[in-house]
């Protein structure tokens, strides 16, 4: 059994039950690395995000529980490898789909330090576990997503979840 101090758990956002890789380096130091199942699908997720972005005309993000692992669309470089926001983490913990409303009353900023908001955010579930989310970033015009956009995000999340199960 390995006990990780609370300060390190907070800084690295390590939650109870999070998978960790534990190994030693050449100097004999013990190294803990967070394991991301969604990160394993990164090249595949990037292709899926690209196709989805072209279909809906929005920037699309695929996130694990900590960061954006794949992005496609106009602003992809602004989002890639960035840490997700606490609001998106909370939404994922609730296993709910977020849909932007007209007038922007329920804004969700998916990524820290980027002032853009999600049109749709759908959780990725694999074997009943929360593993990440698919987000469509609202266009600058602030247009609300169509029913088709919402379904596309939900289907993408379900498909990526199934890929993780196999």
Regions picked out by a protein language model, each given a short descriptive name:
Residues 49-113:
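Structured interaction and signal-relay segments at domain junctions
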Residues 6, 35, 102-103, 124:
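Fold-independent oxyanion-binding glycine-rich loops
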Residues 39-51, 84-89, 133-166:
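Juxtadomain coupling helices with adjacent low-complexity linkers
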Residues 30, 122, 134:
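A broad, low-specificity signal marking well-ordered, structured residues that form hydrophobic/aromatic
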Residues 2-71:
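Intrinsically disordered, low-complexity terminal regulatory regions
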Residues 71, 132-133:
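Short glycine-/small-residue motifs
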Residues 118-125:
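A short, aliphatic-rich beta-strand micro-motif
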């Amino acid at each position: 059994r390995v006990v990780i101090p609370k300060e390190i758990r907070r800084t690295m956002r390590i939650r109870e039950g999070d998978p960790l890789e534990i190994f030693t380096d050449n100097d004999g130091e013990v190294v803990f690395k967070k394991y991301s199942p969604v990160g394993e699908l990164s090249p595949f997720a990037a292709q899926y995000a690209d196709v989805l972005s072209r279909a809906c005309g929005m920037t699309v993000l695929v996130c694990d529980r900590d960061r954006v692992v794949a992005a496609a669309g106009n602003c992809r470089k602004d989002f890639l490898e960035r840490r997700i926001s606490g609001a998106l983490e909370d939404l994922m913990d609730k296993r709910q789909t977020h849909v932007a409303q007209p007038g922007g009353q329920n804004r969700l900023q998916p990524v820290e330090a980027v002032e853009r908001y999600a049109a749709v955010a759908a959780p990725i579930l694999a074997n009943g576990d929360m593993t990440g989310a698919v987000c469509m970033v609202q266009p600058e015009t602030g247009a609300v997503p169509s029913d088709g956009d919402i379904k596309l995000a939900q289907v993408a999340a379900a498909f990526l979840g199934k890929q993780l199960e196999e």
